[in-house]
Amino acid sequence: MKTIRFSIWEDGEYTWPQGYGFVPFLTGYLHEDNKERPCVLVVPGGAYYIASPTEAGIVALDFYHKGYQTFVLTYTTNLLGTIPLKDQPMRDLARAVRIVRSRSNEYSIKPDCIATCGFSAGGHLTASEGVHYNDIEEKNPLYSNVSARPDAMLLCYPVITSGPYTHEGSMQNLLGTNPTADELKYMSLETQVTSQTPPSFLWQTVTDEVVPVENSYLFADACKKNGVSFAHHVFSQGPHGLSLATASWAQGIFGELYTLDPFKYTIDAIKAGTANVDVSKEKLTDLEREFPNHMPGNPCSREPNAEVSIWPCLADAWLHTQWSL
């Protein structure tokens, strides 16, 4: 296996004011046999506050071992909660899809078999890019003629709606505290599905206590109404954030910690006095206390879930059917 990492934005392209040196990047896990393979691009969740390592490398490696070339996107998040993200994460993901597709020969990828795989708020990001890919302007001539449309989406306990079943923290980090009605509708993705929306695989648990299961039902229903191919799996029980739901996941074996890079850059900027926002000592202390809780190796309080843990196999079979692999 070859592991690669590179920024998705070139010098001067990324202007997010609270990056503090961080630039969104892709981490790739590639087979080296030169065989052309399908691709899964993983988008971790974290309420648009962080990109959680619990839904990153371990998921990419699972699909790698199923025969895919895989990537993880570490994208722009809103750790301080002072500037709404708006479309920046969506632009990050669109650029990532374009890069992977444009380098399909280099990475031995089937250019028409690229799936995005998002969890929770990462599922919202994945679905928003999947319904709005035509709206995302690309100014770099290297990628401006490359499609940002995924060939399929895997949506894992996704945030979908800005309506009654929304996840308020995700929407606030994305749109701020006073979004317009148009912004809320644009990011209420069940209202944005068209016949051109990529085929979608959804899964969630009935007992999800953070993102109500109605979110996945809303998107599945919109797919059905618009003639979009989809699969929808609802498992009987389990909390939010199950990721792979395996024993190793439950033991806190999440792999590398690179998706927490924005956390480190932000804390360092605050300590150095270079952050462009006032941060109280109490907030800094809270951040420093919270950071270790997201580190790989820290045991998760949840239990493995055998019922849910089959979802990657279901998704793999579904992708093979969609793409006639």
Residue positions per predicted region:
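Primarily recognizes the serine-hydrolase "nucleophile elbow" in alpha/beta-hydrolase
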Residues: 95-170, 180, 184-185, 189
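C-terminal catalytic histidine-bearing segment of alpha/beta-hydrolase fold enzymes
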Residues: 83, 217-220, 224-325
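N-terminal cap/lid segment of alpha/beta-hydrolase-fold proteins
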Residues: 1-34, 164-168
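Short alpha-helix in the alpha/beta-hydrolase fold that links the catalytic acid
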Residues: 55, 189, 212-225
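Short beta-strand/loop motif that positions the catalytic acidic residue
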Residues: 196, 201-204, 208
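Acidic catalytic loop of the alpha/beta-hydrolase fold
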Residues: 162, 207-211, 241
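Short beta-strand element of the alpha/beta-hydrolase
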Residues: 37-45
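Catalytic nucleophile-loop/oxyanion-hole region of alpha/beta-hydrolase
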Residues: 52-53, 58, 73-111, 306
